[in-house]
């Protein structure tokens, strides 16, 4: 699963590098390399929250595509550079906010099956405490270890 990778191995990191490459062509802002390197080794990245991971990856990919198009239209244009630079900073800011939100939130207390409801059931006999009641009722095996669930 992509969420188990180190941040520098993710699609998001590659898209951020694409944005940085476009900005580096202008050679106007050496700080961008430092910004990207600062967050390069964020791992694990949004552990157990695949939904948010893919939403953020989609936003980042769309912005990277928009920058590719802008770069073709506004080559070596200072207005184009400023706009692309702002996109880059906005994306890094989104990344930081999301990471901080994950640290502050109770993301680890959400069901590993639906990612929506609070965990409230301890699975027997393995004792994994990872699912909500509605998901538990649909399961025959533990989503963590695949052992057969004793529902008595």
Swiss-Prot record:
Zn-finger (RING-type) residues: 111-146
UniProt keyword terms in alphabetical order: Metal-binding, Zinc, Zinc-finger
Pfam families reported in the protein's UniProt record: zf-C3HC4_3 (PF13920)
The keyword Zinc-finger is annotated on this UniProt entry: yes
GO molecular function annotations of the record: ubiquitin-protein transferase activity; zinc ion binding
Gene3D superfamilies hit by this protein: Zinc/RING finger domain, C3HC4 (zinc finger)
Protein family membership: Belongs to the IIV-6 157L family.
Alphabetized PANTHER family for the sequence: EF-HAND CALCIUM-BINDING DOMAIN-CONTAINING PROTEIN 4A, SBP (S-RIBONUCLEASE BINDING PROTEIN) FAMILY PROTEIN
Stated name of the protein: Putative RING finger protein 157L
Lineage of producing organism: Viruses, Varidnaviria, Bamfordvirae, Nucleocytoviricota, Megaviricetes
